[in-house]
């Protein structure tokens, strides 16, 4: 999926507003995913997936950091996410559908925290960005 200049601008602006809340939003999105799609918990058998868990917060930070890195490398998502793609495809063997589920939960989380900024254009740009990230993360499954 090709990101337009407007998409890139919207993504960078949105990530700028997320600022120091990335880890918090990442954890909240994971909690939403676990609650809405309980089968996703099977990938975290060693985690305490309850609300406020230190393990969920830690993984939420990893998710947020990876997305922040991707947002900073919009012209080279495959390069920026190559190691993460290898990890999820070959070691963790995460079902690709789970990236879409987490993406949806991230969009809901961002919209709930920034309703005034979550315009239809920003929503579309972030959705395209997360779909592009998901595509890159699943590229090594083939």
Swiss-Prot record:
Q: What's the effect of swapping residue 69 to T?
A: In allele chain B(2) and in 1 BALB/C strain sequence
Keyword annotations for this protein?
A: Acetylation, Heme, Iron, Metal-binding, Oxygen transport, Phosphoprotein, Transport
Which tissues show it? Red blood cells.
Q: Which residue positions does Phosphotyrosine occur at?
A: 25
The UniProt entry, under InterPro entries, shows: Globin, Globin-like_sf, Globin/Proto, Hemoglobin_a-typ, Hemoglobin_oxygen_transport, Hemoglobin_pi
SUPFAM superfamilies recorded? Globin-like (SSF46458)
In the record, which positions carry N6-acetyllysine? 17
For this entry, list what GO says about its biological process.
carbon dioxide transport; erythrocyte development; in utero embryonic development; nitric oxide transport; oxygen transport; response to bacterium; response to stilbenoid
Q: Which domain of life is it from?
A: Eukaryota
Q: Tell me where in this chain the PTM Phosphoserine is found.
A: 4, 36, 50, 103, 112, 125, 132, 139
Q: Is Transport one of the keywords UniProt gives this record?
A: yes
Q: Phosphothreonine: which positions carry it?
A: 109, 135, 138
Q: Which parts of the sequence carry N6-succinyllysine?
A: 8, 12, 17, 41
**A GO molecular-function term, please?**
oxygen carrier activity
**What residue range is the signal peptide?**
none
The answer on whether this UniProt entry bears the keyword Acetylation reads yes
Q: Where does the record place the Globin domain?
A: 2-142
Binding sites annotated in the UniProt record for heme b: 88
- Residues bound to O2: 59
An example GO CC term for this entry is: myelin sheath
Can you tell me which family this protein belongs to?
Answer: Belongs to the globin family.
Subunit: Heterotetramer of two alpha chains and two beta chains.
Tell me, in a sentence or two, what this protein's role is.
Involved in oxygen transport from the lung to the various peripheral tissues.
What name is this protein filed under?
Answer: Hemoglobin subunit alpha
Q: Can you name the source organism?
A: Mus musculus
Origin organism lineage: Eukaryota, Metazoa, Chordata, Craniata, Vertebrata
Name of the encoding gene: Hba
């Amino acid at each position: 999926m090709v990101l337009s200049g407007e998409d890139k601008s919207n993504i960078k602006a949105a990530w700028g507003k997320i600022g120091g809340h990335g880890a918090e939003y990442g954890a909240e999105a994971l909690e939403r995913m676990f609650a809405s799609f309980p089968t996703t918990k099977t990938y975290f058998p060693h985690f305490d997936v309850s609300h406020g868990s230190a393990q969920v917060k830690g993984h939420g930070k990893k998710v947020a950091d990876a997305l922040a890195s991707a947002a900073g490398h919009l012209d080279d998502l495959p390069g920026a996410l190559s190691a993460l793609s290898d990890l999820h495809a070959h070691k963790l063997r995460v079902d690709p559908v789970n990236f879409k589920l987490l993406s949806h939960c991230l969009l809901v989380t961002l919209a709930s925290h920034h309703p005034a900024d979550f315009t239809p254009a920003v929503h579309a740009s972030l959705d395209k960005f997360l779909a592009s990230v998901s595509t890159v993360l699943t590229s090594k499954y083939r």
